[in-house]
Amino acid sequence: METENQKTMEESTKRKEEKKKRSRVKQVLADIAKQVDFWFGDANLHKDKFLREQIEKSRDGYVDISLLVSFNKMKKLTTDGKLIARALKSSSVVELDLEGTRIRRKKPLGERPKDEEERTVYVELLPKNVTHSWIERVFGKCGNVVYISIPHYKSTGDPKGFAFVEFETKEQAAKAIEFLNNPPEEAPRKPGIFPKTVKNKPIPSLRVAEEKKKKKKKKGRIKKEESVQAKESAVDSSSSGVCKATKRPRTASEGSEAETPEAPKQPAKKKKKRDKVEASSLPEARAGKRERCSAEDEDCLPPRPKAKKRAQKDGVGQAASEVSKESRDLEFCSTEEEKETDRKGDSLSKVKRKHKKKHKERHKMGEEVIPLRVLSKTEWMDLKKEYLALQKASMASLKKTISQIKLESEMETDCKAPTAGSGQECSTQEKVSAQGPQFVTGVIVKIVSGEPLPGRKQVKDILATISEVVYIDLLEGDTECHARFKTPEDAQAVMNAQTEIRKKHSWNLEVLSGDHEQRYWQKILVDRQAKLNQPREKKRGTEKLITKAEKIRLAKTQQASQHIRFSEYD
């Protein structure tokens, strides 16, 4: 009985789990249908070359559902072909075949509409990482959005900051321009973003720019806070100074000590301040002193002439009255400042409250004001033409300056070469370099080492101390290499110094001759031909001009950085 009860309990739990597992696919089915209807819609197929070609390839216009599963947007929704077929059963744009594995358009694709540009608007000043759904939500208030294009950078994948939105009718596009064109005050006056990027080079990420902006803002806030704190501390110090002066009564003996000639001299401003503080301390201590020291005035104060004493007393009285006035003014100012700061704080808080209230009201009403610049695509096309014309003119001027620089450099070289003989020598050298190295016997030295040889430069530097080296044929990590010299005499000079080289570097040297020499010369010619036949990256148009200008700029900077050495006779 117990076993039967356990079995029934297990079955009931399994049924409950099965019921819980029931997936809710209503929203997913709706999203799949919407996405496929968009892909096979007129607006997308006129622009989507790949999908149009796939439809044209098949005889009856059917496309396999597995192709749709390979798309990234469909992967996010589902990878189940049956679920896609289930979602497209009630579609108004596409239809399934009998097996339910392929789909096609119900109506054939017509010609591309002529008013496409008039129905499209250009949008800039978009938020970073903008999405199609966000644009559809914002522009959907003005009409039915048919197509959205958000250009991205190939290297980083970041959006370029602008987009194109196509509406169903011209009126809807005009409405979007009227209601959504609200550019902020900081925005540039002239619309149209035409970002210039270097080909195959990464673009600095948007995060870096954001971080820089944040750092700048933080610095500005810190500076403001510091200035406010400094002002407050200055006010506090001035008020505390006055309070200290009134609290601490200084005796006449302290005053007399300060006025002795032994004390170091101070500037006039400091003296005045000190006198004021002393004066403020004296009147409070006076009342008590009159009672106590009426008879003992002579003991309290140092012996001085009577006239001086009277003058000092008068001065002290005036100073005391001035200080008391100043202290009152300070207190009044401080209270006024506090009141002003309180008023400002209240006003700021009120403004913030009002702003929040308005924002909430807008959200309730659905009137969200977004700082965007919206204009028609035809207007944007005119701006693009203007930009291209400017670019063309600037490139033409750059080309002109490059040609002028070339002419100037040629003129300089002509001035430097006055004799005809030197010119002939140069021409012969150019011909030789064009043809390649000519066969000369006894100029190639083979170097063999027990260990891997150092770099090409190091080997060349070692041999160059004995005679001039033309070329070193060496690959990294090799134990053998070939050194080509200008003349057989140079090669022989190296062979004569073989014993010294062997002691220092443990290299074995040998001059090539006979078949070995001929084979090596053939190898030289083959390697040279292979190098010349290598495919080179062709640079055309603006890219070619910019690279030329960059080379000239680098050459000029190098020339400017060189030291000018004057001879004794200059």
Curated annotation (Swiss-Prot):
Organism: Mus musculus
Protein name: La-related protein 7
Designated gene of the protein: Larp7
Stated family: Belongs to the LARP7 family.
PANTHER family registered for this protein in UniProt: LA-RELATED PROTEIN 7 (PTHR22792:SF62), LUPUS LA PROTEIN-RELATED (PTHR22792)
Biological role stated in the UniProt entry: RNA-binding protein that specifically binds distinct small nuclear RNA (snRNAs) and regulates their processing and function. Specifically binds the 7SK snRNA (7SK RNA) and acts as a core component of the 7SK ribonucleoprotein (RNP) complex, thereby acting as a negative regulator of transcription elongation by RNA polymerase II. The 7SK RNP complex sequesters the positive transcription elongation factor b (P-TEFb) in a large inactive 7SK RNP complex preventing RNA polymerase II phosphorylation and subsequent transcriptional elongation.
Domain comment, as recorded: The xRRM domain binds the 3' end of 7SK snRNA (7SK RNA) at the top of stem-loop 4.
Residues annotated as domain xRRM: 438-551
InterPro entries: La_dom_prot, La_HTH, La_xRRM, LARP7_La, LARP7_RRM1, LARP7_RRM2, Lupus_La, Nucleotide-bd_a/b_plait_sf
Residues covered by region (Disordered): 1-24, 180-364
Xref: CDD domains: LARP_7, RRM1_LARP7, RRM2_LARP7
